């Protein structure tokens, strides 16, 4: 960092990095400067002029604080600190003038605008504007854009801050939005009126400081002050993005991102943001028992008694799905293993070694990507498996990092060196001599689940670890299941994996593992939230989904985080841990807790690092032995980004987005001859 420099802001003297902009220095001093175009995670545009400040001793006009750096300030007389003023008469008059210009063409839509109540323009007009307008001419009107089923546009409200253009170009990595024209004819538009193709496009809704870009599914459904806001964690991928769930009564109305620099910064994927309509459809709201080949509704005592009767004295296997919190995984493990059964969470066949956290989690943090100069991807397509992580890799690439890929070539929104598609390319990488100069540069190896889900998965992982060790790189295992690391941590694994767990089982207790095909032989008890693939067996117990119960999730870097309950399960649905606790009592093996707090105490006793909420534990490096690689090419873990779990498959909007994505990938029809 450069030597700090003293500056005086109003009556406060602070020391700041001279490379900081004036608006950043003001924030450090605790002084709020209004802004519309400036955003700390986007490039500087300097086109709204709302952030004007007075530079004492500088030009006799206000300066844009977002575009001027501290090092450009002139020192005061006799070496005194440079001085800027944010509340002088000059600044006040300038802000009033800028606000008047911004409101010239802005319609009086506040009563019918979805941004009302959380609108930057409303707030800043009240704080810095005047209560009248001198403008008497007709206002400009523009046609709205069709950006697709997610973002609704009202372009007459647009103030041309260009945040949406900069986000789509710089963060999302698409070039479909831009600004055309000059002066009053300038407008934000999409290229050839195309709909947006990014799976992160919903973030422009949050970035828009006015009501020009709003959520199409949420439109006209609620006002901000009607909503109950709950801070929670996303489970649509294994990144564990920080989110806020807004509810009205029993319904989830929308999902928004929360800032977390170490995980998702302030972005979320479109699946995270818009999957909430799947929480309302195809829900299991009562227990069912199969009799004479047909499912019939049952009471809870009846269903639990039938489940206990089926399990007593039988060989049991427990399967743990992708969205199961650590508490429920721990509870099922205790229940099934107490009855002499086996439990398995690696239901996709991933060859993750039990007990070796450096191999099934890695040693790197997500934020290590920011400083990496070299990033090697092995068998992963992060654009589909973790879109927000992919945006972070793109940010590192834009700063000069080099990216390599072993796997099928795909569009990752940034350039990369394609090393190869098969195991031979990985073997060549892991056995290559690496110079000391290269080892000294920060680097990271990222391994996808598709790379380790085949028979030689452990060999792939061993070679990836060898590459990381040889190059002094951090290792990050990119999971696709939000509950996988937590279940691995509690030891919900069987030697030999899924096939070994269900081999010879007479009863299978399926806890939300809808993607597993179970033969017709064993008696199957399904516990889950949606009427998906798994809910067609012998006994069905309706559980809560991630917004309806508090739970502990461990993300792909090994960071324990708490998801909080925002609403209640429909009908007779119950929290997953509570169902297992009640079933244990019915089996005569009552689990030693009667509350979630009691369960967590036992969980932390067994796995102490789970008590370190929002901390990433250091994992001791334990290299794997030598394994022989196969010959196959790498296949990615996710084929359809929008339909990866029961909640997403129940969402009509996710189905529409999936169909649109498939249509874009389909070959164009040949021209008629």
From Swiss-Prot:
Protein residues bound to [4Fe-4S] cluster 1: 106, 110, 113, 119
Co-factor remark: Binds 1 [2Fe-2S] cluster per subunit. The [2Fe-2S] cluster is known as N1b.
EC supergroup of this enzyme: translocase
Cell inner membrane keyword on record: yes
Catalytic activity: a quinone + NADH + 5 H(+)(in) = a quinol + NAD(+) + 4 H(+)(out)
Residues that hold [2Fe-2S] cluster according to the record: 37, 48, 51, 66
One example GO MF annotation: 4 iron, 4 sulfur cluster binding
Family membership noted in the UniProt record: Belongs to the complex I 75 kDa subunit family.
Name the record gives this protein: NADH-quinone oxidoreductase chain 3
